[in-house]
Design a protein with these regions (language model features):
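Alpha-helical transmembrane segments of multi-pass membrane proteins
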Residues: 1-410
Length: 410
């Protein structure tokens, strides 16, 4: 809408959608959608959600990027991205407030009615905002020409595709590791009420910090911390129940926070000009959906255990390597410093740091030898037990897949 319609028509189209969303209220599901026991659960849930909150959710989710685009038109020179941080503050408050302040004190009918009233108020506020745009000059054509000229002069096709790929991959990886960590904590470790809220709250906090401003994300701090915490994750994985439950939660949640800070911090670094803001958020949403589909649908069909967490950690490492290959100060060309490492990533141990100027790359054979020697040395130096003697464990021909993933992470 922002790219293909002038400002006036954008207001009209979005206003029509807001009115249609009001017509669908209240969001109580229809009686015809009550399950009979013969339906596919996933399909039935999707039908209920689409029929009840489909249009209101569509309007709510599209308003945020559209309002940011309008803000950029009304206030040239001011960054609209801080509004995204504020929207995530609202999401965090709703996450923490609903189970403690709303659900215990209101019936479901009361919740639906109050939510409907809130939606009506929301539409009125959007209407006032649209009315205030009447004094904004229509600069869409000039902006489009400037943006097209800028793209032609400064951006190659390869660069645009690379950055578009990062817009998709970074949020996908963040969502995947969020869901993988949640599964790890709530299904593989302990069933604790409201424990699922902790990973989601940390996930939202990383969005808030990253999009509040570039000064809060420092590569040289977060990437080394994540590497150190990876060692803690591996240690907890090998030790298992020997580690206290609080320690496990701290390690896994710390890895989640740092991973999401890197993904979302790099995502903010690659933010476009306001003219492409809506495309940016659309790609972020698509990436988040892909990450969620991988964990929720694809991983259970492919794996017998919670391998999505291990794969998500691996993906974070891969993205860190690839993002470090981009020069953040001069994106006029894609400078893949890590391209040779990427070709052998699945069989290599690569550490790339701009400040320490260290690049360590090994072949698959060298990595396997390193793993064997390291495990042998650890067995000799400390009591490193995972159920069987390590030298015997490595001779087992039919290793569980999770152990292979752990070896790969090492």
């Amino acid at each position: 809408v922002n790219r293909f319609l002038p400002l006036r028509k954008q207001v009209i189209v979005h206003g029509v959608l807001l009115l249609l969303a009001i017509i669908t209220l209240p969001i109580t599901p229809s009686e015809s959608l009550k399950p009979t026991g013969n339906e596919l659960p996933t399909v039935q849930i999707l039908l209920v959600l689409t029929q009840s909150i489909g249009l209101p959710y569509l309007v709510l989710s599209t308003t945020s990027p559209l309002v940011q685009a309008w803000f950029a038109k009304a206030h040239p020179g001011r960054s609209p991205y801080r509004l995204y941080a504020l929207s995530n503050v609202g999401s965090l408050l709703a996450l923490l407030g609903f189970p403690f302040l709303v659900e215990p004190w209101m019936t479901r009918t009361a919740q639906i009615n109050w939510w409907s009233l809130g939606m009506v108020f929301y539409v009125l506020v959007c209407g006032y905002l649209a009315w205030s745009l009447r004094s904004v000059p229509n600069l869409d054509k000039d902006e489009a020409k400037k943006e097209k000229a800028r793209l032609g002069e400064n951006e190659s096709r390869l660069r645009r595709l690379a950055i578009l790929g990062f817009w998709l991959a970074l949020p996908a990886c963040g969502t995947a590791i969020l869901m993988g960590t949640t599964n790890k904590l709530c299904q593989d470790m302990a069933v604790v009420p409201f424990l699922w809220m902790l990973p989601l709250a940390l996930y939202l906090v990383t969005f808030i910090i990253s999009f509040h401003g570039s000064r809060w994300y420092i590569r040289e701090v977060y990437i080394p911390l994540l590497v150190l915490l990876w060692a803690g994750v591996l240690w907890v994985m090998f030790k298992g129940v020997v580690v206290h439950i609080i320690g496990q939660i701290l390690v896994f949640c710390g890895a989640l926070f740092l991973s999401c800070m890197i993904c979302h911090g790099e995502l903010y670094r690659l933010r476009p000009e306001p003219a492409r803001l809506t495309m940016y958020y659309l790609t972020i949403s698509a990436g988040g959906a892909l990450g969620g589909l991988f964990v929720a649908l694809l991983a259970p069909m492919l794996f017998h255990g919670y391998w999505e967490y291990h794969i998500s950690l691996w993906a974070v490492g891969l993205l860190v390597l690839m993002v470090q290959g981009l020069n953040p100060e001069d994106l006029t060309a894609v400078k893949w410093r890590g391209l040779s490492l990427l070709r052998s990533y699945s069989g290599s141990l690569a550490i790339c740091s701009r400040y320490f100027k260290i690049i360590i790359s090994s072949t698959l054979i060298a990595q396997v030898l390193t793993v064997l020697v390291s495990l042998w040395a650890m067995e000799k130096m400390v009591d490193f037990t995972i159920g069987v003697n390590i030298s015997e464990w490595l001779q087992i021909s039919d290793l569980p897949g999770e152990q292979w993933i752990r070896l790969l992470l090492i």
